[in-house]
Amino acid sequence: MLFPLSLSSPLTPSAVKIERENLKQFELENFSRYSIFELVENRSDFYDALLIQLWQEMGLSEQLGISLIAVGGYGRREMFPLSDLDFLILVEQTPIPEIEEKITQFIQFLWDCGFEVGHSVRTLQQCESEGKQDITIATNLLEARFLIGNRPHFDALNELVKRADFWSKEGFFNAKVQEQIERYQRYHNTAYNLEPDIKYSPGGLRDLHLLYWVALHHSGAQTLEDILQSGFIYPQEYQQLQESRAFLFKVRFALHLILTRYDNRLLFDRQIKVSELLGFRGEGNQAVEKMMKCFFQALHRISLISNLLIQHYRENVLSSNQATVIEQLDDDFQLINQCLCLRNSLVFQEKPARILDLFFYLTQYEQANIHSDTLRQLQISLEQLPQKLCEIPEAREKFLRLFNQPNSIKRAFMPMHQYGVLTAYLPQWQAIEGLMQFDLFHIYTVDEHTLRVMLKLESFLSQESAQEHPIAHRIFSQLSDRTLLYIAALFHDIAKGRGGDHAELGAKDVANFARLHGLDRREIDTLAWLVQSHLLMSITAQRRDIHDPEVVMNFAEAVQNQVRLDYLTCLTVADICATNGNLWNSWKRSLFASLYEFTEQQFAQGMKELLDYSEKSAENRKLAQQILTQDYSDIMPISIDQLWERCPEDYFVRNTPKQIAWHTSLLVDLVEALLVKISNRFSLGGTEVFIYCQDQPHLFNKVVSTIGAKKFSIHDAQIITTQDGYVFDSFIITELNGELVEFDRRRELEQALTLALQSEKLSALSITPNRQLQHFTVQTDVRFLHENKKEHTEMELVALDKAGLLAQVSQIFSELNLNLLNAKITTVGEKAEDFFILTNQFGQALDSQQREILRNVLYRNIG
């Protein structure tokens, strides 16, 4: 025992607390000196000694019919600094009041010492009846460990839990696997969550426990070593599990050392501290990213091997009496009861290219899976490969063939990634496996994200995607060959983590891949351009003024043709959706659709002239007039004309006919000088906040502060000033989750905005700090675009997306007498990437001195 208990009798809670602190200090000082298994078992031994001494002091050892038994993680001797003390007090019969009082005092003492205690008092008969009804109780009893008391009584409990009528092998197995299925669903079937749970995430410690429980129930194997000795796992599987288990134990132990309350989630602030304790080093976030890469790789190995062994148990133990249906596929493969099997265990060693045929057959037989024996042969073969699979000409042909098979991403490429075949095929893949970026934007590792992009592309073929992604669905469904898009998706982030521009490096990688695989010059150029430019459409749509003809022209010139536009649109939408499920919403859908349509029009018109928006303005006026005639027939045409004469042409370009008609219906007979209306009916993809009032100081500041205080996301701001000094302000907002705003919330915001605009004072902004943002730093960057423009100035601001940022920026605009014409508000995880169109107080573009003043004030106040 590394840290023996050294407390004299009688024990006191204060003395125990001091001894626990001494133990924790010992563990902190010796964390890197001892193996993690020694530290974990030492804790268990410490608790054993404490509980046995306390049991004896309470006089419970003098009672013949009562025993103290460790269960759960304590029963397994897996005790971490904040683990619960789980134990069973096994009694021969219901305790008499005197014994019951001693048991109560025993448990109360542990509570007084600050322990989290999970306890039960049961007879053998109660253990049987309750264990039969509850798989959790049955599992706890299965891993029971005797501490002190009546040993024969404990042995009787052990015999009970082994009986087939307590839990049959099949019943126990199915119940535990169902628990795993439900647990995986809670974590979206991926281990690669932003702030993962060491215990419950897929591939976490619970997956190891499942393997342990099944083996324990089946054969009584107590440890991984016992399972190895039984022949149930191979030596290399044992080695990988043991290494991964040791790493997760280290992370969990370190986490518990830095916390004061039990938790197994690796939150951002904890990742930093744990990485330091584990000895990871590097500049900036490198230490955390290195640790998390090791962490996710450990989860992946545990998930892969434990699920493979669970499948092996199902196929070779539970299904051993099942009737066999065999279908011969070719000389090397056969289908046995819908499981793909090798006809010769040496196939993959002798003919490595045939590894890819295994996944080809998965695409051809929708209900089939891969037999566990074949998966094990696959793992052995991958470890022994003398070269990358892509170096084998036959393998290259088979790899390309996969892209054109039905459900190829779901049925072939996802499993290929899961089982390590992509690593064996692509030289660059291993570098991105488990690579997590320490930010709030990318919620998956780079490899997981890449496969999700490919899977999202494949989903565009489904009819369900027609409503959510109408343009991508139409384009992707009509493509005769989708191979190029899938390859572009495979490579779009493959160079991350190397340093340098990942898009530029990835473009070189994909060009080399394409040449190696025999693609022609046009295909090579298209692939390289797609990877190099995969962020172009996203930046243009979300951070530029797409109603500016020059922006559309510049984008069209970069894209060059309709084919590339189609490819880029599909890749961009898939990339956004696969980065973070909360990023895509109806507002973004309308934004990208508009850019796509404008660019289509530019290609159709030709590249010699800018798009003529005067036609767009006239068309929108005409359509708005038709809507007004149909839906608002009581409005006099002369009133409409008088109102529209006050509006600049820009107003009719930037608003849809429905919006124009709605605004007109509200304003044409308006008497008041202030109007705030909010609706979901007229703006594509968001809730529109429409404000009409006389221009006033700090107007934008008041509006954004109020909207922010009510916890809405602002996506777009448009300020139109009439010739007589009134403003038509339109803000596109959503709830924080991207949903449209419901009626009660709209009415509440209308009232709040009206009060704010009637007040001469600026209300103080109530800011609730974001827990996650506290652990990130974003370097503030102010960039002025197209500085030769004379009519306005375009500015891009990158900063930490802290609460009140937009209100702070608008306050600075007010203080410098700057007019805001338009704004695009984009949040990328913890980073705000906002775009503003400004003029000075004379309605002109800012000169160099004014730009420099603005830049310095922003840096001084924001970053």
Curated annotation (Swiss-Prot):
Gene Ontology biological process terms in this record: regulation of nitrogen utilization
Disulfide bridge partners, by residue number: none
Segments forming domain ACT: 688-772, 794-863
GO MF entries: [protein-PII] uridylyltransferase activity; phosphoric diester hydrolase activity
UniProt keyword annotations, A-Z: Hydrolase, Magnesium, Multifunctional enzyme, Nucleotidyltransferase, Repeat, Transferase
Cofactor annotation: Mg(2+)
Catalyzed reactions: [protein-PII]-L-tyrosine + UTP = [protein-PII]-uridylyl-L-tyrosine + diphosphate; [protein-PII]-uridylyl-L-tyrosine + H2O = [protein-PII]-L-tyrosine + UMP + H(+)
Region feature Uridylyltransferase, mapped onto this chain: 1-328
Pfam families on file: ACT, GlnD_UR_UTase, HD
Domain HD residue range list: 446-568
Regulation: Uridylyltransferase (UTase) activity is inhibited by glutamine, while glutamine activates uridylyl-removing (UR) activity.
Domain writeup: Has four distinct domains: an N-terminal nucleotidyltransferase (NT) domain responsible for UTase activity, a central HD domain that encodes UR activity, and two C-terminal ACT domains that seem to have a role in glutamine sensing.
Record-given protein name: Bifunctional uridylyltransferase/uridylyl-removing enzyme
